[in-house]
Amino acid sequence: MATQRRANPSSLHLITVFSLLVAVVSAEVFFEESFNDGWESRWVKSEWKKDENMAGEWNHTSGKWNGDANDKGIQTSEDYRFYAISAEFPEFSNKGKNLVFQFSVKHEQKLDCGGGYMKLLSGDVDQKKFGGDTPYSIMFGPDICGYSTKKVHAILTYNDTNHLIKKEVPCETDQLTHVYTFILRPDATYSILIDNVEKQSGSLYSDWDLLPPKTIKDPSAKKPEDWDEKEFIDDPEDKKPEGYDDIPEEITDPDAKKPEDWDDEEDGEWTAPTIPNPEYKGPWKPKKIKNPNYKGKWKAPLIDNPDFKDDPDLYVFPKLKYVGVELWQVKSGTLFDNIVICDDPEYAKAIAEETWGKQKDAEKAAFEEAEKKREEEESKAAPADSDAEEDDDADDDSDDADDKSESKDDEAHDEL
């Protein structure tokens, strides 16, 4: 599929930056989408959930606040809906090369529960039926739901099983545009970037459970009988002081006085009350010292895992052919834009700087202005709301009076 970018000379999407020109020379771009005119001919809206009247519609827009009104993406537009849309590109394999998957996403709705991730799919897919059960190769991007889920998903499919990344990668939660980038390399290492800043990195071997572990604890190993795991022992030189056991736990209160009105004949013989003995230290225990024979906690030695079989193509996705969005949103308003699938991280970085990088300050200013207007409108509406509440309270008082009147009438009727 040909790269799709605007031909408008004034657009920020023009490749005018030197770094981008340099990147173009070396980069192989498999797919690129900025949702310019004609985008609907390149994307297929799924009919998934349509029969249940739960399929959400997409808007082609730059959003309520933006850094360039001409830079449009696709935005979810209906609450409590499922969304599924995909685009096809010429099938390719990332064997022997980097795989870079990048896109921008903005949650204008102050998202409290919903996804902002995208998927790469392999093989042949019926795009009209693309949905939650459609197998995918990579799922990547932010996911937010309540206070517990605010993270970046990086799910890789290996041997028909979806594997979640084991590391936590927090996502952005504000209402501005952010760029998410996933880089997968031939040496089985990866990086996750947000706004061109690396947030996580590592290896496919350690950060996903794609393969069995290389080593395991030796199941036949036994702890030696003379293995000493006690870090501290009683001091053999410490001796109990003479008379220690004779110290009473309580003593007579030396400050206690017999009450003047105490009558021994009537009250019995007066006995001074007891109090805790400050000299009493409890049962004697010898001091603890470092155990000279301490060997630490015993652990079974590691051995090669007989079930481990290395896969030099662990990073390879051989038949990548589609990119799509499939998600559920309680509150709509998420906007996707500037999708790039290529083999050069520098090219993706340059695209991010040419779009998000040049627009972010203007977008933030537009957002702050929109928030200011919203707060002013809410402030103006507050007195009217207060008057309405007073009217409601008056109505409630009237209703209560009517209810009491009706209650009295009922009581009077019962008496008759």
From Swiss-Prot:
Species lineage, top-down?
Answer: Eukaryota, Viridiplantae, Streptophyta, Embryophyta, Tracheophyta
Gene name for this UniProt entry: CAL1
**Binding residues for an alpha-D-glucoside, per the UniProt record?**
117, 119, 136, 143, 326
Composition bias of kind Basic and acidic residues appears in 215-225, 355-380, 404-416
What's the name of the protein?
A: Calreticulin
Q: Which InterPro entries match?
A: Calret/calnex, Calret/calnex_CS, Calreticulin, Calreticulin/calnexin_P_dom_sf, ConA-like_dom_sf
- One CC-aspect GO term: endoplasmic reticulum membrane
Q: Where in the cell is it found?
A: Endoplasmic reticulum lumen
Region Disordered: which residues?
215-286, 355-416
One example of the protein's molecular function in GO is:
unfolded protein binding
Q: Which domain of life is it from?
A: Eukaryota
Q: Which organism is it from?
A: Nicotiana plumbaginifolia (Leadwort-leaved tobacco)
State the family named in the UniProt similarity comment for this chain. Answer: Belongs to the calreticulin family.
